[in-house]
Amino acid sequence: MISSNDFRPGVSIELDGAVWRVVEFLHVKPGKGSAFVRTKLKNVQTGNVIERTFRAGETVPQATLEKRTMQHTYKDGEDYVFMDMESYEEARLTPAQVGDRAKYLKEGMEVNIVKWGEQVLEVELPNSVVLEVVQTDPGVKGDTATGGSKPAIVETGAQVMVPLFISVGERIRIDTRSDTYLGRE
């Protein structure tokens, strides 16, 4: 159990049979009446965001999430196969479970798999990945009217905006949270 006074961004709670992550919270102490905590909660499974108000000191069950480091070994048909780095057990995840993070998954990459009981909630990628550019238009000297960037497709199939000087075959670092170019490797 966790008190509503201990809510912080990132704390996971169980509410209405689902896992919710606290995105924002505000402790409000009005001049008249009792204090309360206004929160913005995100459903980890569906991504829905709700606003919920709790009385100050109200206790709710804290979700016990298990985070395991696993390595993406290969793709079998539609499924993604991961290997636990400690027990060497394999886990198969569907494209729906992996979500849009699949565009940066590369064989041999280590990721964190977050589980609630036996249910996989999310796949956490590293904050940045290094991938090779496989397709991009050549940068023409003096062509900066478009802001100095162009689209590039990396080895996993993801499209990222890169500076004009990047060419095919170069390895670049990409921020997986914002889908932005960080630099050359």
Curated annotation (Swiss-Prot):
GO MF entries: translation elongation factor activity
Function recorded in the entry: Involved in peptide bond synthesis. Stimulates efficient translation and peptide-bond synthesis on native or reconstituted 70S ribosomes in vitro. Probably functions indirectly by altering the affinity of the ribosome for aminoacyl-tRNA, thus increasing their reactivity as acceptors for peptidyl transferase.
A GO biological-process term: peptide biosynthetic process
GO CC terms, sorted: cytoplasm
Superkingdom of the source species: Bacteria
Pathway(s) per entry: Protein biosynthesis; polypeptide chain elongation
Pfam families: EFP, EFP_N, Elong-fact-P_C
Protein name: Elongation factor P
Annotated localization: Cytoplasm
Record keyword Protein biosynthesis present: yes
Gene responsible for this protein: efp
Organism per entry: Thermosynechococcus vestitus (strain NIES-2133 / IAM M-273 / BP-1)
Family of this protein: Belongs to the elongation factor P family.
Main localization category: cytoplasm
SMART domains referenced in this protein's UniProt entry, alphabetically: EFP (SM01185), Elong-fact-P_C (SM00841)
UniProt xrefs under InterPro entries: Elong-fact-P_C, NA-bd_OB-fold, Rib_uL2_dom2, Transl_elong_fac_P/YeiP, Transl_elong_KOW-like, Transl_elong_P/YeiP_cen, Transl_elong_P/YeiP_CS, Transl_elongation_fac_P
Keywords of this entry: Cytoplasm, Elongation factor, Protein biosynthesis
